[in-house]
């Protein structure tokens, strides 16, 4: 099984990370919100999804799921990195990709070898090329 980092612990990131861990992968969920990470480490789940509490608790107890604010360490420890951050609407209604860009650049600065980067955020067509360019800019 793989070691996977998931950037973002909202609905998409937390549910994806917990499910990937439940399949047997080692998953490190990362968020820049220290309080959210502290609460997750205490077993306090910030969202409601049927069955999520049990999946998180089971996988934390097994050592397959962990939570941190240390993006660099999570990226260095992983083969696959999921970007699952918010993409709120911009003033013109398009997706605001600033959080995706920030995370992509953070991933690049932490890379210690080949990584598969998966954009799980809700983004427009062509964002994958932009993520690749942002990563290459930092390498």
Description of each model-found segment:
Residues 77, 83-85, 120:
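Short, well-ordered coil/turn residues at beta-beta hairpins
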Residues 45-48, 84, 135-137:
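Short, hinge-like loop/turn segments at secondary-structure boundaries
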Residues 24, 77-78, 114:
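Short, well-ordered alpha-helix to beta-strand connector turns
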Residues 7-9, 19, 32, 64, ...:
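N-terminal glycine-rich phosphate-binding loop for ADP-containing cofactors
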Residues 52-79, 89, 108:
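A structured beta-alpha segment of the ubiquitous adenosine-cofactor-binding alpha/beta core
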Residues 40, 56, 131-135:
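Hydrophobic packing residues within well-ordered alpha-helices of enzyme cores
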Residues 89-139:
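Rossmann-like NAD(P)(H) cofactor-binding subdomain of soluble oxidoreductases
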